[in-house]
Design a protein with these regions (language model features):
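Terminal targeting/low-complexity segments that flank the catalytic cores of oxidoreductases
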Residues: 1-75, 146-222
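Active-site-proximal alpha-helical scaffolds that flank and shape metal-associated catalytic sites
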Residues: 76-173
Length: 222
């Protein structure tokens, strides 16, 4: 009798490897503004602006991971999503603490357009996490976890600057996500959906960092 368990093709990169490769090209680490914040001595207003924007997008509950868990479009992803949701609850609290510490949003031209853009990002994330296509939300969450390593570097820099003690990183480590996605992305259809979800998440992050870069330029802080 044929097995009902999808076999894993070990001759090609795993689904997590695909997510990581996409992130190397389109993720936060590839964006000049994110790397500028990490590698230089950024203006305090630029750090504050980044914290406020990230809290606006990811500081709300339920968030993208919670929505994906509730939807459960790919049942096999639920244990991994539960772990990710638990870890991200800590990140959400950290964002709230940082937002209070950095003070008011820096005065920047075009604030109304910024608010509309951030609302657009939140809406896009809701669509991804609520997708009924098995693997789409999985890919989006995987990309978020991969990209959050760099995002967390920015947050930790802000924490140091503003006198906040950063909590331990509690999101699933790369090897755990890689193992989960090896099974979740074993079929061609699921793999395509994971890739699509990751691509869309990175596109939203790229737009977010570009928005922050444009705001820094408008303030004369670049």
């Amino acid at each position: 009798m044929a097995s009902t368990t999808a076999s894993i093709d070990e001759t090609r990169p795993g689904a997590w490897d695909v997510v990581a490769r996409l992130g190397a090209v389109d993720g936060a680490l590839a964006h000049p503004h994110a790397t500028r914040l990490i590698q230089s001595a950024p203006a305090q207003r630029n750090l504050s602006d980044a914290v406020h924007a990230l809290c606006d997008v990811y500081g709300r509950h339920p968030g993208m991971i919670d929505d994906a868990l509730l939807r459960g479009a790919q049942l096999g992803s639920l244990p991994w999503l539960e772990t990710a949701a638990t870890g991200f609850a800590i990140e959400r609290g950290y964002l709230a603490q940082l937002t209070a510490a950095v003070g008011p949003l820096p005065s920047t031209p075009g604030q109304a357009a910024t608010e509309a853009a951030l609302a657009g990002v939140r809406n896009a994330l809701e669509i991804l996490s609520g997708s009924e296509r098995a693997g789409c939300a999985t890919g989006a969450v995987a990309a978020l976890l991969h990209d959050w390593a760099v995002t967390r570097d920015v947050l930790d820099l802000a924490a140091t600057r503003f006198g906040i003690v950063a909590p331990p990183r509690a999101l699933p480590p790369a090897d755990v996500s890689a193992k989960a996605l090896a099974t979740l992305g074993a079929t061609p259809g699921a793999r395509r959906a994971i890739t699509f979800g990751a691509q869309q998440l990175y596109a939203q992050h790229r737009g977010l960092w570009s928005l922050l870069e444009a705001r820094a330029s408008a303030r004369g802080d670049l």
